[in-house]
């Protein structure tokens, strides 16, 4: 994604996540398609919102909450990560997903 930087996008590129495609839509909006199958990802207080949609697989994707790890992944599942939100994800199997980044 050219000019505009999205912190979640940049963070995923420093992990095992593989970027399949991305585009900047303008006006503070970006879209990216990703694949991952084994990773532990900490996302820290981004200055934008992220809407995540699982496209395929994701059955072994775990989210860490205050009371432990929770599995909620699978095709057609949505997750909203609002601006300034911190989260930890443990990806233990194949996962194809898209992110919509917006300010």
Outline where the language-model segments fall:
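N-terminal regulatory/effector-sensing and dimerization cores
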Residues: 10-11, 17-103
